[in-house]
Amino acid sequence: MKKNKLAVLTSCLVLSGTFCTQAQNKTPQEIRIPDTYKLTNKSIYRNGWIDFNKNGKKDVYEDPMVPIDARVEDLLSQMNVEEKTCQMVTLYGYKRVLKDDLPTSDWKKQLWKDGIGAIDEHLNGFQQWGLPPSDNPYVWPASRHAWALNEVQRFFIEETRLGIPTDFTNEGIRGVESYIATNFPTQLGLGHTWNRNLVHKVGYITGREGRLLGYTNVYAPILDVGRDQRWGRYEEVYGESPYLVAELGIEMAKGMQTDHQVAATSKHYIAYSNNKGGREGMARVDPQMSPREVEMIHVYPWKRVIKEAGILGVMSSYN
C-alpha cells in the first residue's frame, strides 16, 4: 500500500513538472541561469560565524554560541530607525509587487536596501490573483528555485549594513503555494477526515517541500473556527469545533516543524472567521461576539497549539 502511494505521489510530481515546463514553453535545458549577482564579500564568511556587519570582529549577535536573547539585544542596539522599520515590512515577491526575480544593482536604491522582514511567495510561479502562472525560469526544478532564493538571501547578508537575513514566507493552506508543490485538500476537507496522523503527514510534506524550495516560514495551520458558513474563506478552516481545530492544528504544526524544516506561522489571531454578515475581502468588517464566546471558542485552539506544538509564528487578524 505504501509503495502504491509513493508511486502515485511520484507520478504527480513528475506530471506537475511537465505541466510547469509546458506552460512556460521551455525545457530545463533551454533555460540559462543568469549570473545577475556576484559574490563580493567572501571575507565575511568566517570559521563558524558570519561577519554580518562587515566590521572585522565577532559581535554578540554574530556569535551562534551566545543565547538568542543576548544576540537580539545586541542587534537591536546597532539598528537605526530605517532598519527597524524595514524589519516590520513584508514585500510580496516576483510578479506580485517585486519586479525582479533576482537582485539587481537597483536594489541598493530601493526601500529594502536596509533589509526587509520577509519576502512572501517569491518565485512560486504565480502572479496576481486570477492571472495565469508567471513565466519565470526558476520555478522548476526545485533545486533551481532554492538557488534563486539563496541568491536573494545573499543580497541581504552581503549588501546591507547589518546583513540581517530575510524570511522567505509562503502560504500553506493546502500545501506550499508553489506551482510545483503537492496540492492537498483544503483544511475543511482534511477536517472531515478526523484523522490526526493524516494531517501530521500533510504537515510534514508541506514543511519538507517548503524547505526544499528554499522557504523558511509557511503560513499554516489556520486556527480560525468556522461558525458562519457565509464567510468566503470557510474552506480554509478545519471546522466549527474548537476542539477539532485544536487537535488537527497541533498535528499540522508538529508535522511542519519536524527537524526544524520551516517555521509554522498560524493565522489569524483572532476571530478572523466571524466577520459581521460573513463579509470578506474589501468588504470585511469587524466581528461581533461576547468576551465569553471569544474565550471559549476562538482563543481555545490558540492556547493549545501554542503550548503543545510550539508554533514559531503568529499572523494577526485583519478584519
Give residue ranges: language-model regions:
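Glycoside hydrolase catalytic-domain context in secreted enzymes
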Residues: 19-319
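Bacterial Sec-dependent N-terminal signal peptides
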Residues: 1-25
